[in-house]
Amino acid sequence: MKSIFYYVSILSLLIVININGQGFLKADGRKIVNENGTPVLLRGMGLGGWMVPEGYMLQTSSFANSATEFRKKIASVIGEEETDKFFKLYRQNMVTKKDIQQLAEMGFNSIRLPMHYNLYTPKDKPFEYIDEGFELTDSLLAWCKEYQLYLILDLHAAPGGQSDENISDYIPGEPSLWESETNRLRTIDLWKKLATRYANEEWIGGYDLINETKWNLPNNNKPLRDLYIAITNAIREVDKKHIIFIEGNWWANDFTGLTPPWDNNMVYSFHKYWNNNDLNSISGYLSMSAQHNIPLWLGESGENSNAWFTDAIELVEANNIGWCWWTFKKIGSVNSPWNVRKSEGYDNLLKYWSGTGSKPSVQAAITGLTQQAIYFNNDNCEFNEDMIDAMFRQVQTTELKPFRENKIPGILFGSDYDYGRYNIAYRDNDYQNVNSGTWNNGWVYRNDGIDLEKCSDAISS
């Protein structure tokens, strides 16, 4: 594993210093500030896949895209009891204290936790609660406190699912969040339970009520607004201090009917993927912010090239908008901070599930899954240093930085070109995805436009 170089810009360092021990975050006009009134620009990372596994993160998207589908695939091979053991080990390894420590050292000052409701309240037992989700959240919050990062709670998978996509763990044929009054009441009750538990926690940065609703809602999103207001009212019965983050419909970006604000400590959160990094791409949100004198937060973005990352962060920070990137770990990834390798046994399961391999024995499957869970541990991951350099150092400077130490005489590899911005450190025609497809055809080693492929040739000259 490559050693980690920590990219904390002067501006990042100042912000981290400013937020230390400064109390609750709050909305103040168009800015987020701490209790001293000092502006805080959130620079965050999302813990995607920890509580809500997604197929593309696990290389199962063609046959098990949602968390429920993934669990069913595993249980069909090793049974429910062993499946429970696997997920416990998976969650134990995927997010550790060391992950949070290193994210803080890289320059992040906040974490977004995508929550699955069923880790807090069982699917088949409405309004009853279990310990697992709360205990995981408590542990994460303790680490965030120690390393002074704000933790933003995000309901990523609401009861029934708030969209018809895998990211909400929606199950076709079952009533969605919008088709069940019980599901909506459960959502309200869960948020009140969370707010009661964390009301006095200064390192909770706020509550992101519902992630990426995607539903054809009537009357200018009235059902979404009504539910948001009901959740807000329930939270305010027990917690009057924390920020309420509000996302629009249609992947968080349609705020029709969601203005004006209904709370004096609210932030509008939009998401940004696969579009140009120009003022026009965020102008509608800026206008909404100015009209209603309310802060904005880019609550989710990423899944692109280093050059796109640099440009996106530069754009939003220039407009006093904090951000949170997606996501921190994936199998076979160059565009997350950590790349997770595949175990041989897990790869055999992928082949079986995709119809290209034979079914492994129960014990072989358990062994492969156990090893895969352990591979998610920070100590076993590869750190993608180039991504972090693009997100922090390159936003502040156009200077180059050596990718590695090169000595002459010696062998120099073209793939080890300097860290730096597009058109300065390197050039490639396809270097970002703005609805035009992939930016890298090799998908190894680095997350720039340069197309590298894995090479096993012996080094001779």
Predicted regions and their residues:
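Aromatic-rich peripheral "rim/lid" segments of glycoside hydrolase catalytic domains that contact
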Residues: 308-407, 431
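Short, polar loop/linker segments at the starts of domains and inter-domain junctions
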Residues: 59-69, 282-286, 424-439
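Short, solvent-exposed loop/turn elements at domain surfaces
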Residues: 41, 50-57, 277-278, 333-334, ...
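Bacterial Sec-dependent N-terminal signal peptides
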Residues: 1-22
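Extracytoplasmic
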Residues: 389-461
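Extracellular glycoside hydrolase catalytic/binding regions
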Residues: 24, 185-330, 335-348
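Active-site mouth of glycoside hydrolases
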Residues: 27-34, 39-42, 47-243, 248-256
